[in-house]
């Protein structure tokens, strides 16, 4: 990697760290190429991204960003996962770590808040933004559904009463 490529990588990572809402750092030594490819596919499916960068270059890119405190975790063979959804990258990383014991979550950051490994795992258990939106829409629609059910209930009861009288008259 020549100097221009390194500067381009630092610039790209710097922009990513300034615009992303969550960063997860993990050790990946011992993972096969197939396992890394699987991790990348899973991250991409959830809207997250995985980068393997030289620690020195990543530390330079972290300077001046909200997640600069993550630089202390960059020791050894580390991988950086990030996403704009605060739950996507941690959720995929935690699920992948459960299946692969060679993938060890070191910690991360959400905004200016530093997270240890347990913090990342706790973040992974939270519902995603889409799930929260779906729950909110369900809560908003629930009263309208109840009103519709209540307004049709008397008519349904009246129809059943007339039906019972009709059966009673036919039997007599």
Curated annotation (Swiss-Prot):
SUPFAM superfamilies in alphabetical order: Ribosomal protein L10-like (SSF160369)
Keywords: Ribonucleoprotein, Ribosomal protein, RNA-binding, rRNA-binding
Top-level taxon: Bacteria
GO annotations of cellular component type: large ribosomal subunit
UniProt keyword annotation of Magnesium present: no
Gene Ontology MF annotations: large ribosomal subunit rRNA binding; structural constituent of ribosome
Keyword field contains RNA-binding: yes
Gene3D superfamilies attached to this UniProt entry: 3.30.70.1730, 6.10.250.290
GO biological process, one term: translation
Function description: Forms part of the ribosomal stalk, playing a central role in the interaction of the ribosome with GTP-bound translation factors.
Subunit organization: Part of the ribosomal stalk of the 50S ribosomal subunit. The N-terminus interacts with L11 and the large rRNA to form the base of the stalk. The C-terminus forms an elongated spine to which L12 dimers bind in a sequential fashion forming a multimeric L10(L12)X complex.
Family per similarity comment: Belongs to the universal ribosomal protein uL10 family.
HAMAP family for this protein: Ribosomal_uL10
Protein name (record): Large ribosomal subunit protein uL10
Organism this protein belongs to: Azorhizobium caulinodans (strain ATCC 43989 / DSM 5975 / JCM 20966 / LMG 6465 / NBRC 14845 / NCIMB 13405 / ORS 571)
């Amino acid at each position: 990697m020549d100097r221009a490529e390194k500067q381009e990588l630092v610039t790209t990572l710097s922009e990513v760290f300034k615009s992303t809402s969550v960063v997860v750092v993990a050790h990946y030594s011992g993972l096969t190429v197939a396992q890394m490819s699987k991790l990348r596919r899973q991250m991409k499916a959830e809207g997250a991204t995985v980068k393997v960068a030289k620690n020195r270059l990543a530390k330079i890119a972290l300077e001046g960003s909200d997640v600069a405190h993550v630089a202390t975790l960059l020791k050894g063979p580390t991988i950086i996962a990030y996403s704009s959804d605060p739950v996507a990258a941690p959720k995929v990383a935690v699920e992948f770590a459960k299946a692969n014991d060679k993938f060890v979550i070191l910690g991360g950051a959400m905004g200016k808040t530093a997270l240890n490994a347990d913090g990342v795992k706790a973040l992974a258990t939270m519902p995603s933004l889409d799930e929260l939106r779906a729950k909110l829409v369900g809560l908003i629609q629930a009263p309208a559904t109840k009103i519709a059910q209540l307004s049709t209930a008397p008519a349904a009861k009246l129809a059943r009463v007339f039906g019972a009288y009709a059966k009673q008259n036919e039997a007599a």
